[in-house]
Structures are given as structure tokens and as C-alpha cells.
């Protein structure tokens, strides 16, 4: 999320690639505000939804073809000279020269230079291939800097390679692949690209509609590249709007409820590659960009984990930190496959319902029935908590010993949430939890203290870190003061810290005001460096919780810096140096955000010059535009520029591939699927796939969410006022397909895939239309995924079959997210 939802009102054009009006209705107010001010709204979605109803143009496209669409837009912008050249030359790697040995997918039939066999995976090419990236690099000059061609004409320049790569993505090709009529695509391309540039800006929204694919990361890259090409990053009314699925997805990501990272997006060490702290920091710290500070953030994190026990002599406790055995072994899908195979013995499930909500849920339930024990912490007895009651399962055959811990919902606890726009907001409880129910913080601290008592006196090295870790926040060990938890996340001084003149800057224990003050020598501790500044502390020790600030936006501060705290540094639009030209002047007066004022008071009394404006500068506010790196906005990259050329696991440029299950051959190249996507081979028909052109599974299916329900239904199926809003589980089917297979609105239908089947009611609608794909009619249906076998007994419609029983265990090769937005199915009348 590069921007702020409030700023969407400044957009000249908004492209919603997801169903924002229904799934993010509060944030959608800013889309409507922009529309009131004259902005055009484009909705790109296979289904006509409430978002479509208030948009100027609805663009239905076949699920799984987003890269073809975005690639077509980039090609259109370049071919019609609609890209923002000054921005592109100044702030991106478009002018950088690439190794002449590199070949694009245009040259190699849909592949990139360097595809190799790994020697793993047997005959399955999807686990047996990887890319050798040795030619995916810049040409360097004698000083080790990338060579550049500012004219963008050199055939080895990123720009020319980009142009060549997307030269195949013509309006005609987009029509053949996506099913978007050529005339409509050209209209949309002209509208979006024509409303971007020096004087105008556009923004694009996305959510799981783009991520849940076997090229999910490349979908997002394609979107970002389009925004870079048009000069829409770091500027008012521009940006990339990543819409989160519920109130604290962003916070969970920041604090890293992820397998491969530590809080603050620090890489999780690998056992073999990072045997000691020195090696880890050397390998994971780049030579340029803001991540040169990674040692400060990482050592401060270790100090937050292990306190006084973390010293320079013991690598600040680095050896106590768990290490990954492999870079690709611990994702959600890896874990459940290993669980099914008996490699995982126990499972602690806190606030998740994988029996319903995850991919290939049938596999997940079977896996959870094979454990030694499982703990579920939730506010209701979910399908996961009672997985032994899965319909068709004999409880006597379930091996797993189950423990259920009732949890407290948001209204029963204090704490913070970090929402879509990186905004950390505080909430206070309305009532206490009933009976013996504990808040999350209480439960975790009580559990940790109990385990520490069990392990007290252990002489094993592996136990020392856990025994040293602090789980006491306040005077009552098992009743943590959550503001003190936030203070630890924010960061604090572990000893008195003086400046170079000997003046006291921080007293021991005082909260840090900025992550700039973090150190790599153990003098600071901090649980998540990007949150530093959310807590301030007065000299007398009083905490000032900025997450609890409530000043609404006004004319002087439309970005509402006085409302809560946005990481990093309360900055609302990141990369905002890009809102001004090389000289520090706004590209446009009506799009100004920050600018260089040469007469403003400088960093010291004897100097002048400072970046000023409407937001917190995303870099050193006193760094002049003509100073070294004063013209580089993308500070989190080592080369400080936005990346068109970015070597990921499946290519340096996004390339269209068909979903693993598809109704058509790849019309763009000979390479059908992502060559390095992950597909698991499993016994017992747990992950069978529909072959290309299968007559048994001829229809495309996509899954989605509803306004009236929440995720796997735990927060909605148990509440009558929400559960009654839909009569039953349903499948959306076009009028054309319904007529073809003899289905009427309200009929029961069976939707099946090679993995499983569900029964639902048919919702026959004109909101879905068949696609014409290369002259062939392709039908697509849509099925929400909120239902499970539990719900309100008096409302039978609150219960239903599990949509995710239909999906497969396949994954994107970079982050291993599932492909649940595009796969193949069959639809038959009745219960079959």
C-alpha cells in the first residue's frame, strides 16, 4: 500500500480490479468522493457487482488473465507515447543497461534466459525447474555502477527490453486471451493512460483477486510497473491501493505472522546459509538504500526478544533464534501437505479456520485428523475446532487429541489494529471477557510463563532463549498492559544514550521517537522498527500513544496526520520524493505533495533548505535535490529507483501464463503454465488436476467474498442478523450457461472438480456473461467461500458445503500463495 485511502479523492481516474464497494465499503467512500470531483472509475472484474454499478466502465475479463491485461496497457502506453518519460528516466531503472546475454520471453517462446532442471521432483516439471539468474543483471561501469542510456534507445536498456517483451500484448491479443472486446480495451487503455502523467494521476486497487494465482506476485508487479510507467507512484491521486481482507491483515503482516520473515520485514534466517549473526548481516544487508540499516533493526529486535540476556558476546542471542531449514518449507500449503504426510505432529491454531478457509480444505481437514494433538483458540467452536465432526468422518478414526481455548473478540480487549493504509489505530474494550475467557495477550503471556516454569533449570542451549524472553508487561505477570507491549514494539533505549556532545538523548527504558535512533550495538531494543514513533514518552515517563490520536482531516491536513499513526514515521504517501522533479519542484501545482524550500531553516542554525509540504518526507528532509541521492525516491531498493526489471523466481518481467487448470492453451506462447509454479503430488486423489481441454470440467470457476459474510464465516455464520441475509450457499451462473445445461434460478446444483464437490443453489444472473476466447465460448461461474457445516441451527441457510474443497494445492513460486481465483469445474443440476 503506497498511498492513503483518503488521497484517492485526488485521483483523475481509478481502476478497481477488485470488488471494493462490497468488500471494502468504508474505504470506497473515497472512490465516490473522487467521482464527485470528476474522476472516472473503471471496474475490471469477471462479475458485474456493486462496484461495477457505480463505475463509468465495467471491463469483464476471464479470471487468470490479469498479466495479459496489464501487459496490454503497458504496451499501449509505450506505443502511443502516453508514458511519463521524465518520471521514468529520472526515477526508475528504465535507462539501465542489462547483460547482453539476457533474452526476454518474446525471444524464447514464453520463457526467460536460464531455465534449468533442479534434479528434484522426478518427472513433474513444475518442481523440477528453476531459473539461473546469472544473466539477469545490470551492465556495470568501472566503479560498479549500472550503465545507463538516458535516451532509452539502447537495445539493452530496460526500457527497450520492456517494450520488446510487451510488444506481443496487442489489443487483439488481449481480446483473444482475456475476452475483452478490442474496442473496449482500447477505450479503457486510452482513458487510464490518458489520465496519468505530469498533470494527472490515477490509482489502482487490488486484493486477493490478483494475489491468489500461480503468478500472483507477478500480477502485483505488473500493476506496479504500469503505475511507474505512468508516473503514478508517490504522488497525490496515484499509488497502489492494496486492500486488506479484514481490519488487521496489515498488522499481522507487519509483525510477521509469516513463515519467511521476522517483524518489520526482516528475512528469517536460514539454518545453513546463516550459521551466525555476522554471516546473516553480511548476506542480508545490501550496499545501498535504506536497508543498509538492517543490522540496527535486527539487533534491536533480538534485544526486544531476549532483553539483558542478549549481549554482543553471545551474538545478541542469535543462536537462540529458530532458523528455517529451507526457504520453501513452511508456507501454509507446505505445512498442510507435511501434516497430511505425518511430518507435523502438533498444530496450534489461533484465530484461523483452515477447515473452511484455506485451499484444498478437504486435504487440510484430513491432515488435521492425523495429528497427535491440536489447540484451537477462537471465539466460536469452528469447523477446525471440531474437525472430528467433519460430515462423513467417523470420530473413532480421528487420531488427533483436541483442545479448545475460548478467545475474547475485539470488544472485550484493548489493543491496536493496523488497517489497509498502514494506519495503526487503538481501540478500547467495551466489556470484560466472560468467565475465565482471556484476551489474546493474557493467554499468550500465561502460557509462556507456564512453559518457562516447566523449563526452569534446563541446561540445554536451545532453551536459554525462551527462558530469557520477557513476557511480563506491567505489575501483574498474567495481565499484560498492552500499551507496554506496544512500547516494546515501538522500541526503547536499553541504557542511557548520549549524543556526540555528551547530551542525554534517551534515558534507559525511554521509548524511541524514531527508528533513525536504533543502533546495532545493543543500546536499543525494538520489536518492529517500522512502528517506531507510535509511542512517545515524556521525561517523567508518561506514554503518549499516537495510535489513539483522533484529530480528523481538515483543509490544512487532508491526509489526517493527527488521526492515529501510519508507519513509517506517520508518513501517509510513501516514496513521496517522486512527487517532485529532479530540482525538487512539484511536477504539477495541482498535484503537489512535498517540495524543496531553499529558504526554510536547515538541519543546523547555519544552514538553510528543507523539504516541506503536505506529508512527512520519505527520506532525509534536509537532503537537497542536488546532493548525492537527493533525487532518488525509492529508498528501500539498493539502487534507489523503481524497478521495471526485477528478477523474481519466475522472471524479471511479468509474463502471461494460463492458470494450472485452464479452458484454453496459452495463446501468447508455447509455455502453457508458469514453468516454476509449485504443484504437489499427493496420494488418495487429494490433488488431482483437470487436464487442458477436459470435457469433465469445462467451466472456469472463481471464488469470492460477500459484504454480508466474513472470510470463513466464523464472524458471520453464527450471528443471526448476518446469517439470515442469504437464504443459502449459492453459485452464480450466467443465464446463457443455465439455459445450456437446463438450470433455473434456485435449483440445487452440484459443482465439482477433481478434488471434490459441493451442493449449492443456483443464482442465475445476467451479472456474469460468457467469454469469447479465441473464437470459443468459455463459461465462468462464481462461488463465495464463507459456508461450512456449522452455523445457527434455526437458520439452515447459515450452513453449507465448503467451497474450498474444490480448489487445488498449487502455488506461486515466490510466496506460495494458492490459486483459488481461477480453476476448472463442472456444474450439474441436482445433487449428483
Can you say where each PLM-predicted feature lies in the sequence?
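Long, C-terminal catalytic modules of enzymes
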Residues: 415, 422-523, 528, 535
